[in-house]
């Protein structure tokens, strides 16, 4: 089992901002996961990968695929207190779910 977090490279977020947005996404998606899957993922070392996309549109395409397949996911919108405008979509976490399911949705994306 693993989780993929896809962040928008086109926003050119600072390293700290990127780390915070990825953390928000990861935790939010885990909250959407059933107890059994969450325990399995945590017991397996909480495997995750951070990937990049170049648009908000791509993040919503990924969200649609995850929703269609019944995979937990969370889209993050920034509060706008520092670098970005309020409501800016920054990233999506997909999973945790099986490696195969995550790879089917995110396999064409590059590492961040």
Swiss-Prot record:
Its EC number is 3.1.1.29. It is an enzyme of class 3 (hydrolase). The natural substrate for this enzyme may be peptidyl-tRNAs which drop off the ribosome during protein synthesis. PANTHER family: PEPTIDYL-TRNA HYDROLASE 2, PEPTIDYL-TRNA HYDROLASE 2, MITOCHONDRIAL. Pfam families: PTH2. SUPFAM superfamilies: Peptidyl-tRNA hydrolase II. The lineage of its organism: Archaea, Methanobacteriati, Methanobacteriota, Stenosarchaea group, Halobacteria. This is Peptidyl-tRNA hydrolase. It comes from the Archaea. The keyword Cell membrane does not apply. It catalyses: an N-acyl-L-alpha-aminoacyl-tRNA + H2O = an N-acyl-L-amino acid + a tRNA + H(+). One of its GO terms (biological process) is translation.
